[in-house]
Amino acid sequence: GIVECTKFYQRDMDARSLLNLKLGETPFDNINEIINSEKGFSCGSGDSFVNKKIEMDLDLVDMEAYALAKVCKLEGINFKCFKYISDNADANATSDWIENCKKGAKLFQIKMKNL
């Protein structure tokens, strides 16, 4: 189904070996997480496809939500994020994504009508 994400993290920034930072923290950036509500799912964004378990404790991963949430935070714009979980980020991710994409599109149409 469709889930609402309210917590956003950058999952692929890794400066741990250079500085005393956690995975996902960007050096010299004061915004390393965006939490709009404790209710809802956590989402880790990065520029790589995920096909195995990652080190961060996240509900789901994508490639764009953190950037959108951060721009909205910086500009004072309310941000709502709904995601359709298309696959389990495993060896079957590609075939699962293809199979589930049409289902997700239909569910998003229903969700948008009910907002």
Where are these regions (language model features)?
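Glycine-rich phosphate- or other oxyanion-binding loops that anchor nucleotides, phosphorylated ligands
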Residues: 1-115
